[in-house]
Amino acid sequence: MIDKQKQKLNMKVQWAKFAVVLALYLLFLVWVESWLGLIVVPFIFDVYITKKIHWQWWKDEEGPVRFIMSWVDALVFALVAVYFINLFFFQNYVIPSSSLEKSLLTGDYLFVSKVSYGPRIPETPLTMPLTQHTMPLVNVKSYIEWPHWDYRRVKGLGNVKLNDIVVFNYPAGDTLVNEERYQANDYYQMVYSIGDQLMQQNGQEKDVRAMSPLQQRHYFEQVYATGRNYISSMPGEYGDIISRPTDRRENYVKRCVGLPGQTLQIKNRIVYLNGKANKEPDNVQYTYKMKLKGEFPIDLADELGITNEDLLMYNQSGVIPLTKKAYLVLKANRKLVESISINTDATYGDLYPLNAYTGWTRDNYGPVWIPKKGESIALTLKNLPVYERCIKVYEGNDLKVDNAGRIFINGKQAKSYTFKLDYYWMMGDNRHNSADSRYWGFVPEDHIVGKPIFIWWSHSPDHPGFSGIRWNRLFTFVGNIK
């Protein structure tokens, strides 16, 4: 009698557990708008109620089988849980470089929310948890490209706002060489740079400034083909040319300084949107030419937030990235500083678009209109280099220009184009030391990963061990860093 009562009570508990799990799972399916997941419901029912499948058969075994399978069971459960949490809710991200200093610092560990902008349904769902694209140690792909799902984003708490700090997939990371030494390099910049050098050596270099847009296009196509053919012919040096799907490209973090539909222009380092100056971040940095009368004191460097990387740049090139506060302190220190002035060196090379001469520099750039979903733009040979990558690569169209300068999209002559996606303009706060949209262009909406919420850990690479912990940054909300 007692056993029957216990059994009956146990079934009530199991039914209650099943009801809770089923309710949560159905709410999840409603959120992601995918009823394909209903095929899992019978298995959930079996786990709690019918128990036809002996899910934990290994518990009946003895010896090493039981021991090994208990660890396998725990590991598989943990990996699956991490996979879904990272995919739909949040993930960890560590700041690898100084491009956002002094707002976010190298060694800051971020809690990145996926629900802020809405998580993406994975493009490549079959991937090893806790990896981005490569298995550690064995150096092979950590994902399978089939099945491949089209871009779709689940409804989130909001949209990307102006001046948000955003984590996204590197747009120019669709193509790269698989030799490890060069994987961090921008493939397209590398191709154009090599092509330009080879054409100089062969006496084929020309002054593009005097060319028409069509002549420029033909010339840069030749530069690109020369560089790509050279890389392809040197597999021992560069390895194979490979591609990566959107969600397997490297994660970057920058500040959004331009929204879809806005016209962006940089004039004397200040970002203007639709003709109005956008507020600079409080800790924005620029590089300064500096001449010292002696060695830079370490305690002063720590006080001003100047890192070993900053000092190394100064020792190698005579320029150093500084916030306005640090600049004013050093300018007033006549005993240490002989001269200091902002670095206004014009840098024309490697700026986006790579296949046209614009005369733009990192401090004086544009204007460019940022594409907005559903809005159209008239296409000309002059503006085509700015929007060609959006049309061809990000939105999957076939685009060609004939010898008469006529533009064809998917085989039909086109004088305008209507965009299918929203795009953003991302820049680092370390303005003279950041690879950002000025170098590789727009960030499509399908590349947006998430929004950093707070810094859960921070450790300076300049100070080993306990002394490197930045206690004042722990659990700092990123939204409070303006």
Language model features: what each stretch is:
Residues 1-482:
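Extended hydrophobic leader/signal-anchor segments used for secretion and membrane insertion
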